[in-house]
Amino acid sequence: MAEAPVDLSTGDNLEQKILQVLSDDGGPVKIGQLVKKCQVPKKTLNQVLYRLKKEDRVSSPEPATWSIGGAASGDGAPAIPENSSAQPSLDERILRFLEANGPHRALHIAKALGMTTAKEVNPLLYSMRNKHLLSYDGQTWKIYHSRQEGQDIAHSGVTQESPAIICQHNPVNMICQQGANSHISIANSNAIQIGHGNVIVREKACGEPGPRTSHPLPLAWDASAQDMPPVAHGAQYIYMDKSLLQQVQLGHHNEMSLVGDAGKHPSYSFSDSPPEVSTTTADPGASFNMQTFEPGPHPEGDTVQTVHIKSCFLEDATIGNGNKMTIHLRSKGEVMESGDSEEPKKEDTGTSSEATPPRSCQHTPSDSMLPTSELRAMALGDSSPQTTEPVLREHEVQDIESSQDTGLSKQ
């Protein structure tokens, strides 16, 4: 008996017919046979077949040959099984796949879903990470919550709140990162310490009473607490894109001393033409890896702090371990003392481990102009226990050229 023609007014009818034909044959079916049995043009049939393949409902073991159900990917990554009684969402299918097979790369997940490239599944994976369903270590994806928690969140359709943005309300912010998957966003801040054992000291300006204030970051290991078990710091992954960083310490055991109040600088907008700041002229982005060398036991090995900087404006920043920066501000129009050259100087990093007393404590004027493509008073690198600490001084002067004072020190 001849097959009844398929109503092409709806795609569902054609999908059901294709699945029925493939299921009845029980094996691979040539595209020519499908065209005859479904009685539709080959072009229309192929469009539906490839859509079903992307949904992992059919597979193509050979060219122009189709069979029911998904197939294992060619690189050994297992396929996500199809549940014919229900149609789970892509989120749920990814959760099931990762729970059954463990952490996998994005490409393996994409192929298990019937896709061909990692780019097709990456938006979904990052969306699931923002919902705290998945975690990513830079190589592989894995489940963040337990299976039941992941199912509840995926079925509820409720999106978890994004991590709160921390806005500065105090002279110095101290942020302690806890947990393996904690996420911190910082906006509109300066005088920030990112790392362990850092110290920022803000000295009073000339004529202002009162002692200087120190804001050390709490140490995770205290030798006096003998009854406390040693705990190693967790690895830190820091990404900065189109940001303005002033008086920022990235690394461990850095010291920064500020004499007088920080000058008011014009606000920068990164929406139109962000300044490209880099350690090299060829690459607009830079990455740094830093190892801790702090005292105390480290049961899990040395801690790595990975920092990636792209299109940022950095002023008075230290990147590395054991750096020391002292900043003296000079106001516009100030007369240079005898013996000073007309251009700002960078001190020899090996001549002294103590900060030179400030020659002036006047504030930097609010209309001082800053370059948008330079690193200013920035220390890069690590300081070994045997070497002296570097001292960098910044002098604000009258014009733009003399204000472009960049200090780079690597020991």
Curated annotation (Swiss-Prot):
The identity of this protein, by name, is: Z-DNA-binding protein 1
Q: Where is this cross-link: Glycyl lysine isopeptide (Lys-Gly) (interchain with G-Cter in ubiquitin)?
A: 17, 43
**Does Cell inner membrane appear among the keywords?**
no
This protein's domain notes: The Z-binding domains recognize and bind left-handed double-stranded Z-RNA structures, but not A-RNA, the right-handed double-stranded RNAs that are structurally very different from Z-RNAs. The second Z-binding domain (also named Zalpha2) acts as a molecular switch regulating pyroptosis, necroptosis and apoptosis (PANoptosis). The second Z-binding domain is essential for sensing influenza A virus (IAV) Z-RNAs.
State the span of motif (RIP homotypic interaction motif (RHIM) 1).
Answer: 188-205
Q: How is it modified after translation?
A: Ubiquitinated; polyubiquitinated following influenza A virus (IAV) infection.
Q: Where is this region: Disordered?
A: 60-86, 263-303, 332-411
Using the record's annotation, list all stretches that form the Z-binding domain: 8-70, 84-148
Lineage, highest ranks first: Eukaryota, Metazoa, Chordata, Craniata, Vertebrata
Q: What is its main location?
A: cytoplasm
Superkingdom in the source lineage: Eukaryota
Q: In which tissues is it expressed?
A: Expressed in lung, spleen and liver. Lower levels were seen in heart, kidney and testis. Expression is greatly up-regulated in tumor stromal cells and activated macrophages.
Regulation acting on activity, per entry: ZBP1-dependent necroptosis is normally inhibited by RIPK1: RIPK1 inhibits the ZBP1-induced activation of RIPK3 via FADD-mediated recruitment of CASP8, which cleaves RIPK1 and limits TNF-induced necroptosis.
Presence of keyword Nucleotide-binding: no
Short sequence motif RIP homotypic interaction motif (RHIM) 2: positions:
237-261
Stretches of Polar residues bias are at 268-292, 350-371, 400-411
Q: Name one GO biological process term.
A: activation of innate immune response
Q: Which UniProt keywords apply?
A: Antiviral defense, Apoptosis, Cytoplasm, DNA-binding, Host-virus interaction, Immunity, Innate immunity, Isopeptide bond, Necrosis, Nucleus, Repeat, RNA-binding, Ubl conjugation
Induction remark: Expression is activated by IRF1. Up-regulated following interferon treatment. By lipopolysaccharides (LPS).
Phenotype upon gene inactivation: Mice are resistant to necroptosis, characterized by a decrease in epithelial cell death and an increase in virus replication. At a modestly lethal dose of influenza A virus (IAV), mice display significantly increased rates of mortality, probably caused by a failure to eliminate infected cells and limit virus spread in pulmonary tissue. Perinatal lethality observed in Ripk1 knockout mice is rescued in knockout mice lacking both Ripk1 and Zbp1. Skin inflammation observed in Ripk1(mRHIM) mutant mice is abrogated in Ripk1(mRHIM) mutant mice that also lack Zbp1.
Q: How does it assemble?
A: Homodimer. Interacts (via RIP homotypic interaction motif) with RIPK3; leading to RIPK3 activation and necroptosis; interaction is enhanced by CASP6. Interacts (via RIP homotypic interaction motif) with RIPK1. Component of the AIM2 PANoptosome complex, a multiprotein complex that drives inflammatory cell death (PANoptosis).
